[in-house]
Amino acid sequence: MIDAGVDDTVLEALASEHVLSLDAVLVTHWDKDHYGGLCNIAKRYSVGEVIVAQGAAQQAPSEIEDSGLNLVEVERGDTIHVGRFVCTVMWPCETVDGDDNEDSLVLLAQYVEGSAHFSMLLTGDSEVDQEHEYAPAVGDIDILKLGHHGSAKSVDMSLLEVLDPEVAIASAGARNSYGHPADECVAALQNYGARFYCTIDDGSVSFFPDARGIRVHCSGSRGTALE
C-alpha cells in the first residue's frame, strides 16, 4: 500500500477489499495527509514494514517512532517486487529528510503477465520541477498518478510529451480548501488527450490490464471503461 491518508478512509477501503494484512506500507513523505492514518492501520492490520526514502527514517514523526513499526529506507534504482509488479524507485536521487513535497518517494510500477501489461508512475506530492528530472528515465507510461493531488504545478505539456500517458488520475478530497485538482492541470491533460479521472467525481479507481488494453473501473458514475 502507498500512503495512509489522514483519517479512517483508508481503513474502510482496506475492509472493502477484504485485506487481511499488509506486507508493507510505503510512505512517500512525512506530510500528515500521507502518513496520518498509519498508526490506526497498524492497530487493525499486521504491517510487515514501512518503506521510506533514504534519510527519511531518521526524521519520522514521533507517533511513527513510538509505534514500533519497522522502517526500511530505499534509494533511487532499488526495486520492490509485489506479485507480478516490479516497482522501481525513481526519486529522490539523494538523501532527504522526507519533510517536503520535493522529497516524495516516486515509483515506476510495471506489470507483465503474458500479453497483459501496463506501467504506472506514482508521484507522491512531487511537482514539475522534480518530475522533469526523473521523467526521461521513466519514458512512456500508460497511467500517471498526478503529483500533489493534481495541483497547478503537477503537470505541464512538456512533461506529458515525455511520459505520454493514456490515463491520468488525481487523488483529492471533495471540497478541499486547495481547489485540487487545479484547472491548469485538467486543461493540460485535456489538451494533450489523456483521459482524466479524479476520486472526487469517480470514487475509487481501479485498473485491470488485459490483452485488449486497460480496463478502468470507478465506483462512481463512470463505471467501467476500456482504455
Briefly describe each language-model feature range.
Residues 1-227:
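Non-globular, low-confidence helical/coil segments that flank catalytic cores
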